[in-house]
């Protein structure tokens, strides 16, 4: 009963991870955040494999899913540190999330709740010609906190998924071991006698009484 509930819970967690990461992937595409797009894509593939392993009782798939969750948590911790500008990181000057190929920022920077975007003209000399220079004001919630909330939710789901993945793998392994033990005992206790393929033929003699009359 506990194993069934744990397996069902892991399936639910995988489903929630897929929904949340797909929502995040859409907004990362809108903001041209190439590093998160790549990480999200890999995460989607691994979660699908973990979901398949949970449904089909494949412990190797679930183990790979659990290992990936450790890396996924590490990535989301880095994203949180980036947007909160921990250490030497700066969300305004560093272009890590776009692989340094564009100056795009998070989609939520201009489209957050209550944000008002104002174009600045003329643009500074250092601004690229294909980019507009803007100011954003009036946001109810700054974009970096929205990104931090997204990453925090992913961390919570990943930790829950890791715990239940380990539990399900443990239950599947114990169940397989018990089946192997029962099968080995039955085959040993109830194995029929072996038939030899070579039979030695012996001549048979019959004594027939003779009538002297």
Swiss-Prot record:
Keyword Cell membrane: yes
Membrane association type: Multi-pass membrane protein
Superkingdom of origin: Eukaryota
UniProt keyword terms in alphabetical order: Cell membrane, Membrane, Transmembrane, Transmembrane helix
Record-linked InterPro entries: Na/K-Atpase_Interacting (IPR008516)
Gene Ontology CC: plasma membrane
Transmembrane segments: 5-27, 35-55, 62-82, 153-173
One Pfam match: NKAIN
Assembly: Interacts with ATP1B1.
Similarity field: Belongs to the NKAIN family.
Name by which UniProt lists this protein: Sodium/potassium-transporting ATPase subunit beta-1-interacting protein 2
Organism: Bos taurus
């Amino acid at each position: 009963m506990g194993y069934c509930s744990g397996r069902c819970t892991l399936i639910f967690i995988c489903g929630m991870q897929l929904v949340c990461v797909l929502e995040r992937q859409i907004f990362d595409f809108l903001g041209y955040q190439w590093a998160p797009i790549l990480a999200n894509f890999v995460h989607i593939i691994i979660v699908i494999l973990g979901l398949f392993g949970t449904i089909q009782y494949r412990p190797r798939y679930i183990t790979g899913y659990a290992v990936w969750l450790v890396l996924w948590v590490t990535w989301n911790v880095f994203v949180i540190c980036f947007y909160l500008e921990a250490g030497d990181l700066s969300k305004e000057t560093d272009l890590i999330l776009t692989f340094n190929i564009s100056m795009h920022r998070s989609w939520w920077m201009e489209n957050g709740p209550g944000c008002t975007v104002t174009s600045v003209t003329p643009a500074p000399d250092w601004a690229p010609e294909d980019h507009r220079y803007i100011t954003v004001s009036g946001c109810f919630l700054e974009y970096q906190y929205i990104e931090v909330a997204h990453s925090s939710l992913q961390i919570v789901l990943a930790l829950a998924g890791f715990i239940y993945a380990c539990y399900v793998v443990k239950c599947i392994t114990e169940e397989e071991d018990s089946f192997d033990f029962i099968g080995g005992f039955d085959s040993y206790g109830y194995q029929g006698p072996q038939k030899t393929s070579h039979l030695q033929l012996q001549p048979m003699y019959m004594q027939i009484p003779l009538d002297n009359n």
